[in-house]
UniProtKB/Swiss-Prot annotation:
Chain's role: Functions as a ribosomal silencing factor. Interacts with ribosomal protein uL14 (rplN), blocking formation of intersubunit bridge B8. Prevents association of the 30S and 50S ribosomal subunits and the formation of functional ribosomes, thus repressing translation.
One GO term (biological process): negative regulation of ribosome biogenesis
Assembly information from the UniProt record: Interacts with ribosomal protein uL14 (rplN).
Coarse class of the protein's main subcellular location: cytoplasm
Pfam families: RsfS
Lineage: superkingdom: Bacteria
PANTHER family recorded: IOJAP SUPERFAMILY ORTHOLOG, MITOCHONDRIAL ASSEMBLY OF RIBOSOMAL LARGE SUBUNIT PROTEIN 1
Entry keyword Repeat: no
Family that this chain belongs to: Belongs to the Iojap/RsfS family.
Database matches in InterPro entries: Iojap/RsfS/C7orf30 (IPR004394), NT_sf (IPR043519)
Keyword list, A-Z: Cytoplasm, Repressor, Translation regulation
Stated name of the protein: Ribosomal silencing factor RsfS
Subcellular localization, as worded in the UniProt entry: Cytoplasm
Amino acid sequence: MNQKSILKIAAAACDDKRAEDILALDMEGISLVADYFLICHGNSDKQVQAIAREIKDQADENGIQVKKMEGFDEARWVLVDLGDVVVHVFHKDERSYYNLEKLWGDAPLADLDFGMNQ
């Protein structure tokens, strides 16, 4: 499965759990870590965990290997490593503090091109 398909599956999982401000940064040629960063946030610890759990469940259902998941128990910043796609699920407060969008401001936004409830 290609990176764009993985990105869309992960974004749809975020949307299914009503994640807010879902966006993807095209990191190809900018970061050695991943080709895409998918960033979103939830408004509570429970929502952050639900989003991360849904990403993992959808990855499993689609045969996508979850290489690592960090921060789930704390639910402030959960990182889900799907290989060339790394998903950052923040608690709302942490997202504004770390501001990855600004940190990686030279990365263009990737088109997610499907209906989302943002």
